A protein has these predicted regions:
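Short hydrophobic beta/alpha edge segments that flank linear recognition/processing sites
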Residues: 26-30, 55-67
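Soluble non-cytosolic domains of exported or imported proteins
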Residues: 1, 68-69
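Acidic, glycine-rich catalytic/binding loops that coordinate metals and/or anionic ligands
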Residues: 49-58, 77-112
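Extracytoplasmic/periplasmic cell wall- or extracellular glycan-interacting regions that localize
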Residues: 1-7, 101-102
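Zn2+-dependent peptidoglycan hydrolase active-site motif and core
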Residues: 6-50, 72-73, 77
Length: 112
């Protein structure tokens, strides 16, 4: 399947390999800190392991058709404090690395 890339820095919290035709099938969950996690599901193959440090844009998996899925696609989910939120606000393919780092610094400084 098509390559799947992480949308932010984080640590792989879990990887689940499943060919059962239930749920999300094969999936990766990345913990980004500050209460944020992303889930990438219905994958064909996972290229990372639990505990791996991940960088934004890093290749993590191949798109697939596992779990409850009628055709190959990616289920992309953002959660904040375990509540699903609209993912459209959390990715921007055109954002430069410099702008991304600037935003991350603002988030970190607001926590202090």
């Amino acid at each position: 399947g098509d390559p799947i890339y992480a949308t932010g820095d984080g640590v792989v919290e879990s990887t689940i390999y499943s060919r059962a035709r239930t749920g999300y099938g094969t999936q990766v969950v990345i913990n980004h800190g500050f209460g944020y996690k992303t889930r990438y599901a219905h994958l064909n193959k996972i290229h990372v392991q639990r505990g791996d440090s991940i960088k934004r844009g890093q290749f993590i998996a191949d798109m697939g058709n596992t779990g409850v899925s009628t055709s190959p696609h990616l289920h992309y989910e953002v959660r904040y404090r375990n509540t699903p939120v609209n993912p459209v606000h959390y990715f921007d393919k055109d954002m430069s690395e410099e702008r991304y780092q600037e935003i991350m610094k603002q988030i970190e400084s607001s926590r202090n």
